[in-house]
Amino acid sequence: MVKKGSWFSAIKRVFTPHSKEKLANEPERKSGKEKKKKGFGKLRHGETNSFLPIFREPSSIEKILGEAERDHNLVFRPPTPDRPNPYSASPPPRPASPRVASPRPTSPRVASPRVPSPRAEVPRTLSPKPPSPRAEVPRSLSPKPPSPRADLPRSLSPKPFDRSKPSSASANAPPTLRPASTRVPSQRITPHSVPSPRPSSPRGASPQAISSKPPSPRAEPPTLDTPRPPSPRAASLRADPPRLDAARPTTPRPPSPLADAPRLDAPRPTTPKPPSPRSDPPRLDAPRPTTPKPPSPRSVSPRAVQRREIVYRPEPTLPVQHASATKIQGAFRGYMARKSFRALKGLVRLQGVVRGYSVKRQTINAMKYMQQVVRVQSQIQSRRIKMLENQAQVEKDEAKWAASEAGNDNWDDSVLTKEERDSRSQRKTDAIIKRERSMAYAYSRKLWKNSPKSTQDNRSFPQWWNWVDRQNPLASPAPSYSQPQRDFRLTPSRLCPSPLSQSSKQHHIRLDNHFDTSTPRSSRSTFHTPSRPIHTGTSRYSRGRLRGQDSPFKDDDSLTSCPPFPSYMAPTVSAKAKVRPNSNPKERVMGTPVSEKRRMSYPPTQDTFRWNKGSLVMSNSSSHRGPGSPGGVVLEKHKTLKSVGNLSIGSTASMATTVGRKEFNRFV
């Protein structure tokens, strides 16, 4: 079907008023505006939306209409006010208007699917109907008398009815259908969608032209009986059928008698259309130029201008559509990308702020923890250093005290005065002398020496002596000495460890003394003691200051080496008498040496002792006496502790350490 916008633009070009006719056409324009207001919001039959773009070139019909306008100058005369009754039998004849071949602007009927009648296809040489007084009233419902169709080439009768102004009677009356034979005699083949425009009143181009109106019976006979002579426009239409067919893809369809039914019976409700310029009767009489004249800006609506601009736009092809779609997609994707980028940038900024704060807080906490750990470690290290320093100081002090004690073992820490110490030393010396006397007496008696049984069974010995013998094992078997040798031992051949001291078991000094066969020596004896003075003596004078590990000898060690008859328990005559019956007569004779009394007559005195750098010398000479001379017992200095016989230094036979003690020197 043909687009309606082109016909509407053609109608606008035909009926465009001039600026000088503005005052004369003012009432008509006002009535047109009033009509438009009544029909606002509805599209009339055949009207299209002006905002829809139309992509096509001008059709051949429009070109033909343009040529027809150039060939014929249509002059519209205003109709007379006294119009005969439209329903009269004989319409008054009208002189033929010079616009016989002028194209009639297309009515909105072009949208109807029916094939236009031959009378509608040819340009009707009808002069515009004179406006009746009712024409000024918009949408008049009274029927308008048809204008007489005089001087038509096809001997047209007056117009049966005005399609643009339906009357009330005809609108209420049922529409009369035209017989199919009315359009059959026309042999012209034209597209059903291309009706030729007919010159009509300005209201013919208005939307009211599409309203269906039943044709009057008076108007039909001239159309049916009188053959219409071919007009120049019809000839041109017949001459250019290929152009019509090429412009319209639809094939021609034979007219059917039912084609007019939709147009007559069912008028399409349409939205209001912008007011189109309507020419008044005086404007119809103005001569028309042969060429289409561009409408003035004041008379052409913006919609018409817009439609004129886009009418000749070519239809977009597939590459153009693809390019347009690509551009649209690119713009949309760019917009979405920018939007997402902005959102992402804000999110990243927010995350940076939050993470920066959290990282800062974590760093602060970590630094605090590290500072606390370092502080604790430093405190622990300082305490360890202090402990090590204190320990080193303690060890140093202990070593210093140990060194001082080791170098100053002869320190006397007693609170006694010098006189008291001297008196005690004198008493100890006297005790030692008494012990020597008792030992000499014991050595003169060999009863207990040759017979161990007599020693154990001797009831004259005190009880502690037997207990000590039972507690101390024998170091070596007691050698039996023959009579000719006359070898006398100073002490019993038993080790005498101290039960109260540990070091006394390790340090035993044996007295290696061999007496002559004649008599035991009771002369001066030399005792070699270790360099360290030994604090011994009777329990009566012991002060208990020596330690067990420092002093290997105790006062109790003298118990193991005590003679059977100490000085304070000298055997009486009765005791000797008791011992003599139990002894051997031979030993009894041999056990009493001749020189016993003589030996005891030379006891050592205090003035015979002298201090010799850690040793005691109890003789005028430091060498042994010969066998014939009064010998002495010598305790050599160079012998070790364990190589000096069986005699213990701490025994009663040993010398007191306080004998001849030097004055104390602290820093020696």
UniProtKB/Swiss-Prot annotation:
Name its GO BP terms in alphabetical order: plant-type secondary cell wall biogenesis; regulation of secondary cell wall biogenesis; xylem development
The keyword DNA damage appears for this protein: no
Q: What happens when the gene is disrupted?
A: The double mutant iqd13 iqd14 exhibits abnormally large and round secondary cell-wall pits in roots metaxylem vessels.
Comp. bias (Low complexity): 97-120, 166-175
Q: Name one GO molecular function term.
A: calmodulin binding
Region ranges (Calmodulin-binding): 1-11
Task: Please note every region of biased composition (Basic residues).
Answer: 32-43
Question: Positions of the region Disordered?
Answer: 16-54, 66-305, 399-431, 476-561
The terms describing its cellular component in GO are: cytoplasm; cytoskeleton; plasma membrane
Compositional bias of type Polar residues: which residue ranges?
A: 516-529
The record places domain IQ at 321-350, 343-372
- Would I find Phosphoprotein among this entry's keywords? no
PROSITE patterns, from UniProt? IQ
Distribution of this protein across tissues and organs: Expressed in hypocotyls, cotyledons, leaves and petioles.
Pro residues composition bias: which ranges? 78-96, 269-279
The family database entries (Pfam families) matched by this protein are listed as: DUF4005, IQ
Localization of this protein:
Cell membrane; Cytoplasm, Cytoskeleton
| Basic and acidic residues: bias regions | 18-31, 415-431
Superkingdom of the source species: Eukaryota
Which keywords belong to this entry?
Calmodulin-binding, Cell membrane, Cytoplasm, Cytoskeleton, Membrane, Repeat
Report the function annotation for this chain.
Answer: May be involved in cooperative interactions with calmodulins or calmodulin-like proteins. Recruits calmodulin proteins to microtubules, thus being a potential scaffold in cellular signaling and trafficking. Regulates cell and organ shapes (prevents twisting) in aerial parts probably by regulating transverse microtubules (MT) arrays alignment. Regulates the formation of oval xylem secondary cell-wall deposition pits through microtubule-dependent lateral inhibition of Rho GTPase domains, thus confining the area of active ROP domains within the lattice of the cortical microtubules.
Q: Which family does it belong to?
A: Belongs to the IQD family.
Q: How does it assemble?
A: Binds to multiple calmodulin (CaM) in the presence of Ca(2+) and CaM-like proteins.
Supply the name of the protein. Answer: Protein IQ-DOMAIN 14
